[in-house]
Each structure stands twice: as structure tokens, then as C-alpha cells.
């Protein structure tokens, strides 16, 4: 039986800002550029009490808390702290799979320290993070990645939670299905329409029914409802693609997709910055009202070096590539693929320096 730990830094970007500027401590801090189409990168726990969340439009965050202090992201500083945290991880195991700057999976089945209890390993890691970075982290401990990720949210901030193999069903079955990664608002609504509200409800449905309604994701739902996740922790797995998608409650015409594409371009760009790599190919994904998936891509001579460039290419793909204009669409996605390491200094400065919001 594997011992998997999911470590998630608490309000990471905002916490770094509060650590480095005592004047921000105890105040609602929002890490974001200002602008009509900017999104929140992170919110301090004080800001979260007003309902502010990551990926929320910055203008909405400002409406929710007019007194919030907006701080532009400093990704170079966040990456430096992230490297400190990863060095701590590697003291305990070489099986470390970073998901972003602020979270990672660790397989501690055979911890370097010789510690047998995964809970003790997680506690020591969190203590070392606190002592060496003055930041807090939460952890989930479980037999697989799926359960460990859910568990890491259970005692936030600055806590940890374990799901023992013998307690998987007792923990999982009462959960709302929207706690399953990948089940957003639209999917949650579709499941509710089928009478599926909890994981226990989901487990009652046969695989064939779930696949009929949700395609390949139906198989994932079937397995997650049983606590099954056989994915290994993949050490330092390099990101090959990043994307963001929107599923609509009502199907939209092609010419109504522009604002969604602009917002998704920013979300994808923010996620790309966390990888410290360059994405060279822009990918547009569309799902029609009859569930047909269309993808279009373009690889420019120079990779996109701003969210604006990414958005412009994605928008151009809807206009310059033959698409059925009379068709209505239920999903749009914007992504980057063909990733490589940042080597050119000028490109690195363009990619990871100051990023103005789309105007």
C-alpha cells in the first residue's frame, strides 16, 4: 500500500507578500494586476472572508471588498520560495511531483529518513517549511493521489488530515460530488439532474450509464467514486501542456465566445508562468452542442510572450480557420502546448517579468 502526501502551501502568493511586508499582515490582500480582464492570482485568508477566491475577476474582488489591498504578482520571488520548499521535500523522498509553485505530491512509502508513519513525515515537512520559510502548509495523507488531494483541504490552513485505507468509504461516500477534482458547477448540475448529489449516489450508477452521459470522464467518475487512483507519483514531471476551459449553461454562437476566450487566455497564461517553461503552440478547443469536439492550433515563429499575444492568437483561430459559424458551442478552451525550458534571457524577461493586464 502506497503512502501519498499532498502538500499545499496556504494562500501561497498572498502569504509571501504578508511575510515580506509586515504592513500587510492581518489585512485583506489580493495578489492581482488591476484591469477589466485581470483575475485574482491569490487571496489572503482575510480577503477570503469577503468571498474573494483565486481565478475570480479582479473587478469582482474589488466590489466584494473595496478595502482590499491589491499587490501585483512577483513570480520571481514566489519561485525562489518554491525552490526552498521543494528542497525540503527532497530531504524526505525523491518521488516528488510538483503540480505548481505551491503544491506537490510526495510518495513517502520509503522515506529517506526511515520514518514509517506518513503522518509523521508530513508533520515534519510542515514544521521544516514553517521554520525555514516562515510560511504554513497543509497536507493530506492517503493511499493515492486523488484522496490525498482532497484530504489536504480538510484542515486548512496549517493542518493535516489522513485518510487511512480502512476509512476510505467512511470518508468518501458522504461527500458531495463537487469535491471530486474535475467536477465543476456545470458538471455538478448535470449530475444533480440525474439524482447524483453525493459520492454514495454516484457509486450506485453503473459504468455504462456514466459513460453514456459523460463519455471518457464517466470512467473517471466511476473510479473516483470507489476511491481508486492508480496513478504513480511522477518525479519532476515536465509540463507539456496547459489549458483552461469554460462549459456554458446555455450553448453560445461562435461570435459570442470572445469574452470567454480573453478570460481563459489570462487563466492559461497565469498557469503557464507557474511552470517556468515556454509554450510554443496555441490551441483552441471547442465542443459543439451535439458534443463534437473541434481543435485548432497555431505555432508562431516566436512563442507568445504575453497573455495579450496568447489571446490574440486564440481569437484569430476562431476567425481565420474554417469553423461552422452556424453551429452553437457548449465549451471553449484555450491552451498552450509544445513546452520547452526557458533558456533565452530576453524571452525569459518577457515571459516572467511584469505582465500587464489585457485592456
From Swiss-Prot:
Domain named UmuC: residues: 4-184
Site (Substrate discrimination): 13
Superkingdom in the source lineage: Bacteria
Cofactor: Mg(2+)
Cellular component aspect of the GO annotation: cytosol
Binding site residues for Mg(2+): 8, 102
Gene Ontology MF: a single term: damaged DNA binding
Pfam family, one: IMS
Entry similarity comment: Belongs to the DNA polymerase type-Y family.
General function of this protein: Poorly processive, error-prone DNA polymerase involved in untargeted mutagenesis. Copies undamaged DNA at stalled replication forks, which arise in vivo from mismatched or misaligned primer ends. These misaligned primers can be extended by PolIV. Exhibits no 3'-5' exonuclease (proofreading) activity. May be involved in translesional synthesis, in conjunction with the beta clamp from PolIII.
Protein name: DNA polymerase IV
Biological source species: Xanthomonas euvesicatoria pv. vesicatoria (strain 85-10)
Lineage: Bacteria, Pseudomonadati, Pseudomonadota, Gammaproteobacteria, Lysobacterales
Amino acid at each position: 500500500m502506497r503512502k501519498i502526501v499532498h502538500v499545499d502551501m496556504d494562500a501561497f502568493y498572498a502569504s509571501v507578500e504578508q511575510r515580506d511586508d509586515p504592513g500587510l499582515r492581518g489585512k485583506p490582500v489580493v495578489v492581482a494586476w488591476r484591469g477589466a480582464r485581470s483575475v485574482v492570482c491569490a487571496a489572503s485568508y482575510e480577503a477570503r472572508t469577503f468571498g474573494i477566491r483565486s481565478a475570480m475577476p479582479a473587478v469582482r474582488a474589488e466590489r466584494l471588498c473595496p478595502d482590499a489591498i491589491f499587490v501585483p504578482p512577483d513570480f520571481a520571488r514566489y519561485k525562489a520560495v518554491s525552490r526552498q520548499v521543494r528542497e525540503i521535500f527532497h530531504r524526505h523522498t525523491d518521488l516528488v511531483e510538483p503540480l505548481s509553485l505551491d503544491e506537490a505530491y510526495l510518495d513517502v512509502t520509503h522515506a529517506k529518513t526511515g520514518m514509517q508513519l506518513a503522518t509523521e513525515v508530513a508533520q515534519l515537512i510542515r514544521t521544516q517549511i514553517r521554520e525555514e520559510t516562515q510560511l504554513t502548509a497543509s497536507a493530506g495523507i492517503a493511499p493515492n493521489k486523488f484522496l490525498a488531494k482532497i484530504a489536504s483541504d480538510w484542515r486548512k490552513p496549517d493542518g493535516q488530515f489522513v485518510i487511512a485505507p480502512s476509512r476510505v468509504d467512511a470518508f468518501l461516500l458522504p461527500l458531495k460530488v463537487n469535491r471530486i477534482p474535475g467536477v465543476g458547477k456545470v458538471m455538478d448540475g448535470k449530475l444533480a439532474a440525474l439524482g447524483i448529489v453525493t459520492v454514495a449516489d454516484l457509486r450506485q450508477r453503473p459504468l455504462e450509464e456514466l459513460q453514456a452521459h459523460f463519455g471518457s470522464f464517466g470512467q473517471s467518475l466511476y473510479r473516483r467514486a470507489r476511491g481508486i487512483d492508480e496513478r504513480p507519483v511522477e518525479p519532476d514531471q515536465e509540463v507539456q501542456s496547459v489549458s483552461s476551459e469554460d462549459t456554458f449553461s446555455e450553448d453560445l454562437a461562435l461570435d459570442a465566445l470572445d469574452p470567454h476566450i480573453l478570460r481563459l487566455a489570462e487563466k492559461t497564461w497565469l498557469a503557464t508562468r507557474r511552470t517556468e517553461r515556454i509554450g510554443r503552440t496555441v490551441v483552441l478547443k471547442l465542443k459543439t452542442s451535439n458534443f463534437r469536439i473541434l481543435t485548432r492550433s497555431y505555432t508562431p515563429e516566436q512563442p507568445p510572450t504575453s497573455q495579450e499575444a496568447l489571446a490574440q492568437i486564440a481569437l484569430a483561430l476562431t476567425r481565420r480557420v474554417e469553423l461552422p459559424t452556424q453551429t452553437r458551442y457548449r465549451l471553449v478552451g484555450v491552451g498552450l502546448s509544445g513546452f520547452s525550458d526557458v533558456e533565452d534571457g530576453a524571452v525569459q524577461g518577457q515571459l516572467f517579468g511584469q505582465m500587464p493586464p489585457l485592456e
